Swiss-Prot record:
The gene is MPK8. Residues 104-395 form the Protein kinase domain. The active site is at D230 (proton acceptor). Disruption phenotype: More susceptible to oxidative stress. This is Mitogen-activated protein kinase 8. A motif (TXY) lies at residues 266-268. Activated by threonine and tyrosine phosphorylation. Activated by two independent mechanisms, the binding of CAMs in a calcium-dependent manner and the phosphorylation by MAP kinase kinase MKK3. Activated in response to mechanical wounding, hydrogen peroxide and jasmonic acid (JA). The TXY motif contains the threonine and tyrosine residues whose phosphorylation activates the MAP kinases.
Length: 589
């Protein structure tokens, strides 16, 4: 999609999240007067209850007219389509047993990886395009299954236009023996990482619009006492109409302490380039929602620069880049750092003066830079909250509190499983209970103590399996309609619901059965040669395995530049001790 022309109805749709609408549906042109700033003719934020969801997770619907004709459409990578075999069209009919006959009309495989398969489809009830992700062997590893449970639960509870939405989860055939799950999502076209790479002509209005959506979504998430903990451009889904949605809540956590702004989790492994300074070297024993605000600041700076702001090679290099730009922190900030060796490291650092933001971003709006300074404050207590940032003068004429709702903190009972040691059967039962939230009749029977649900409400998953198997078998065949490849090779990093691991041209299902083993070996070999000097703890399995249901990394055919970016940035499993002795000394208090 080209980057020129007036923004049309699709641009308005970000504020028209009605149940039957799709932010990825095609838009039609109309003639609007051009405005440099969006104009709101009316404002109302309503909440409607969805019968498939709990009462405390009402869907937010914005009902207002927005003229954003000053924006242009953004470029997003296009897919090559793999049309269905006309002789196999009948296999698209499924879910007849549970009253869902023909609801989802499968169109094409848009993603494939060790986790399973993603197919695009059309919901015949609403007409919107959706993505259906089949996750294989959910319970192979309890840790992965727990992460999936956490994300399914959070995405059910966090119902907001700026957070990716689960539309439906398919009923498994057996309560106690199922292994795979099928999750239906709204279909998004790309992610912010790809948008930044593909568009060198973004306007100040684009930047403002993007940041507004991120902060509005984050305000809602933080009001629920949820910390995302891994915000980065690849975890922000995007459409050509400029709509953004936050995804990948697999690392998110909910705070239940009496003081919800002071939390500590020992398993935190955020992507380094977007990691707040208090997380580098375990500087703070406690951290706050300000960790997400820092990440948003880094993302906003990347939009303005067209490249990452702090592309550190390791933790120490990351700190050096931060202090080179922001200056060394003042003594009062250093004094609040609990790690003694970290305090000594920063105290002994040569005095650095901050670089004026106007020098780093000479073409940026001064109001944007003043807000960016508030987002990138070194000391977390000095960072603006999402709510405060939305009230910044930068959003004058755009921000409206009635369109920026808050919510109640999530109940502690929802995440009681986090405090228990779970086995596979425990997680399976908890995920099954979450699936029933999308099947209200069965949920009612379940809550009454019914134990024969699969006999009362038969599952359509078996038919769905055959449908996915057919798609996988025909994906990439030389004679298949569409030219043998269903995904574009240049799509290397993706968040659901887009392609992950495109199979080589001409590869059959049998030939691709060992794709994970071969790709993992190739990645391991590449990393061994390119990371020899660093001794990094980069895991090939972790690159291939997608534990997140709404966003994940992938291995694809990468250019040298993209491969180096991935290796440098995506070392999510690094521990400080794996880098250098210097960093290890910071880690050990």
């Amino acid at each position: 999609m080209g980057g020129g022309g007036n923004l049309v109805d699709g641009v308005r749709r970000w504020l028209f999240q009605r149940p039957s609408s799709s932010s990825s549906s095609s838009s039609s042109n109309n003639n609007n007067n051009n405005h440099e700033q969006p104009i709101f003719n009316s404002s109302s934020f309503s909440s409607s209850s969805n019968p498939n969801h709990s009462a405390n997770s009402g869907e937010l619907i914005i009902e207002e007219d927005l003229d954003f004709s000053g924006l242009t459409l953004i470029n997003v990578p296009k897919r090559n389509h793999l049309p269905m075999d006309p002789h196999k069209k009948g296999e698209t009919e499924f879910f007849t047993e549970y009253g869902e006959a023909n609801r989802y009309q499968i169109q094409e495989v848009v993603g494939k990886g060790s986790y399973g398969v993603v197919a695009s489809a059309v919901d015949s009830h609403t007409g919107e395009r959706v993505a259906i992700k089949k996750i294989n062997d959910v319970f192979e590893h309890v840790s992965d299954a727990t992460r999936i449970l956490r994300e399914i639960k959070l995405l059910r509870l966090l119902r907001h236009p700026d957070v990716v939405e689960i539309k439906h989860i398919m009923l498994p055939p057996s309560r106690r023996e199922f292994r795979d799950i099928y999750v239906v999502f709204e279909l998004m076209e790309s992610d912010l990482h790809q948008v930044i790479k593909a568009n060198d002509d973004l306007t100040p209005e684009h930047y403002q619009f993007f940041l507004y959506q991120l902060l509005r979504g984050l305000k809602y998430v933080h009001a629920a006492n949820v910390f995302h903990r891994d915000l980065k451009p690849k975890n922000i889904l995007a459409n050509a109409d400029c709509k953004l949605k936050i995804c990948d809540f697999g690392l998110a956590r909910v705070s239940f302490n009496d003081a919800p702004t002071a939390i500590f989790w020992t398993d935190y492994v955020a992507t380094r380039w977007y990691r707040a300074p208090e997380l580098c070297g375990s500087f703070f024993s406690k951290y706050t929602p300000a960790i997400d605000i820092w990440s948003v600041g880094c993302i906003f700076a990347e939009m303005l620069l067209g490249k990452p702001l702090f592309p550190g090679k390791n933790v120490v290099h990351q700190l050096d880049l931060m202090t080179d730009f922001l200056g060394t922190p003042p003594p009062e900030s250093i004094s609040r750092i609990r790690n003694e060796k970290a305090r000594r490291y920063l105290s002994s650092m040569r005095k650095k003066q901050p670089v004026p933001f106007s020098h780093k971003f000479p073409k940026a709006d001064p109001l944007a830079l003043r807000l960016l300074e508030r987002l990138l404050a070194f000391d977390p207590k000095d960072r603006a909250s999402a709510e405060d940032a939305l009230a910044d003068p930068y959003f004058s004429g755009l921000s409206n509190s009635e369109r920026e709702p808050t919510t109640q903190p999530i109940s502690k009972l929802e995440f009681d499983f986090e405090r228990k040691k779970l086995v596979k059967d425990d997680v399976r039962e908890l995920i099954y209970r979450e699936i029933l939230e999308y099947h209200p009749q069965m949920l009612e029977e379940y809550l009454r103590g019914g134990d024969q649900l699969s006999f009362m409400y038969p599952s359509g998953v078996d038919r769905f399996k055959r449908q996915f198997a057919h798609l996988e078998e025909n994906q990439g065949k030389p004679g298949a309609a569409g030219g043998g490849r269903s995904t574009a090779l240049h799509r290397h990093h993706a968040s659901l619901p887009r392609e992950r691991v495109p199979a080589p041209n001409g590869e059959t299902a049998e030939e691709s059965s060992d794709v994970e083993r071969r790709a993992a070996a190739a990645v391991a070999s590449t990393l061994e040669s390119e990371e020899a000097d660093n001794g990094g703890g980069y895991s090939a399995r972790n690159l291939m395995k997608s534990a997140s249901i709404s966003g994940s990394k992938c291995i694809g055919v990468q250019s040298k530049t993209d491969k180096e970016d991935t290796i440098a940035e995506e070392e999510d499993n690094e521990t400080v001790a794996e880098l250098t002795d210097k960093v290890a000394s910071l880690h050990n208090s």
